[in-house]
């Protein structure tokens, strides 16, 4: 069959699902990094203010991921709909899942701005390395710097242990390092696994304002983007918040979850903190996982895993606040700097206790999938103004109300 006749397309490159017979054993390699910095009591108040404390608690242990299982799910991911296409229908990871699994806030300002040209593109911006010195008190040696990134090892060596009698300002410096590493490893890891990008400097400059951002929607935007990239048959590495993806699978697909993990707390992803998958026979396990997905029926998927009394008993109430809950069913944009994705929950209404109607056609955002911030820095709230406006109007786009004004 000629490439032009392939059913699975992604920006001109065929979807891996269309090549299973030719390449039956592509197992994605998970690109991940552990933050691995102790959480000091004096840093915790800043994390609570930033709404990142629950994520920091997840950071205390390394989360292993089953690469063969994730690879089988990627084969069923459709970039057009941001859903997994299963034998029983569509399902996906939503903002509700992010809240329960990672304990992140959903409502808030988008995580956006520019990447490096702070002095040129933002009000009160500073040259990147000048700002870095102001925030961290020093510059890393040139051997630890590559363009606008710094080696993880430098932060580990310099800021891993807070001095016993640190001043308040020293605590703030170490807090910036902790949060920078936390965001770069747990939520927004990319394929450059050994380096930290300077895009976070404007956020770290104002620790007291970090709580006003929608970390949950940004994390989901980045996971969607990484999954969409992963469907490209030529891609072999997968980054992003993979502990979210794997925990979502285990919570919603009981036949695929490991045994012996019945106890759980909050955030719900902590349930699998001690899970260690097999690391051998990856191709064979991929085939087994693929067959398991082929045999799934509607009763094999837990549509509402968070409605149980056991879950209600451990949930922290702040994630259930109205301003966050209302967005779980919003059909809206998801923003993480240059990565813009679409929250298409109108296709998975049973995950919210609803009855699935025939959904509208998928929103064509193929051109957005070609944008990743390379090719020149920009002020993304202006460059992607339409999509930022959609997030600004997010409360008007809940499927519990009218969808007519959400998408033209």
Task: Map each language-model feature to its residues.
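Structural stabilizers in ordered domains
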Residues: 1-408
């Amino acid at each position: 069959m000629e490439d032009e006749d392939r059913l699975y397309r992604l920006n001109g490159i065929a979807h891996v699902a269309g090549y299973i017979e030719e390449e039956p054993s592509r197992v994605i390699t998970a690109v991940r990094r552990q933050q691995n910095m102790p959480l000091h009591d004096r840093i915790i108040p800043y994390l609570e203010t930033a709404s990142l404390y629950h994520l920091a608690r997840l950071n205390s242990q390394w989360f292993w991921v089953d690469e063969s299982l994730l690879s089988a799910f990627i084969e069923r991911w459709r970039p057009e709909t941001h859903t997994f296409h299963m034998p029983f229908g569509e399902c996906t990871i939503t903002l509700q899942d992010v809240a329960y699994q990672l304990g992140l806030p959903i409502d808030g300002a988008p995580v956006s701005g520019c990447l490096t040209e702070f002095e040129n593109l933002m009000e009160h911006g500073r040259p990147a390395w000048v700002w870095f010195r102001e925030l961290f008190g020093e510059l890393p040696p040139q051997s630890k710097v590559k363009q606008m990134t710094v080696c993880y090892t430098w932060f580990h060596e310099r800021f891993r242990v807070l001095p016993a009698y640190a001043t308040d300002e020293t605590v703030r410096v170490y807090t910036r390092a902790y949060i920078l590493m936390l965001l770069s490893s747990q939520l927004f890891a990319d394929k450059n696994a050994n380096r930290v990008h300077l895009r976070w400097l404007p956020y770290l400059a104002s620790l007291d304002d970090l709580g006003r951002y929608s970390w949950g929607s940004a994390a989901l935007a980045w996971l969607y983007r990484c999954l969409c990239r992963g469907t490209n048959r030529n891609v072999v590495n997968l980054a992003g918040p993979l502990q979210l993806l794997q925990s979502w699978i285990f919570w919603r697909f009981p036949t695929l979850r490991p045994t012996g993990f019945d106890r759980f707390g909050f955030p719900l992803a902590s349930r699998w903190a001690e899970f260690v998958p097999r690391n051998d026979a990856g191709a064979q396990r991929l085939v087994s996982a693929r067959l398991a997905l082929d045999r799934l029926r509607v009763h094999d998927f837990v549509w509402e895993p968070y409605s149980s009394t056991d879950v209600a008993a451990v949930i922290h109430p702040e994630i259930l606040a109205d301003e966050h809950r209302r967005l779980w069913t919003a059909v809206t944009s998801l923003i993480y700097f240059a990565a813009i994705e679409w929250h298409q929950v109108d296709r998975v209404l049973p995950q919210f206790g609803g009855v699935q109607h025939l959904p509208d056609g998928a929103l064509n955002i193929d051109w957005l999938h070609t944008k990743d911030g390379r090719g020149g820095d920009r002020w993304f709230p202006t460059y992607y103004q339409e999509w930022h406006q959609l997030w600004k109007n997010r409360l008007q786009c809940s499927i519990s109300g009218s969808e007519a004004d959400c998408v033209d």
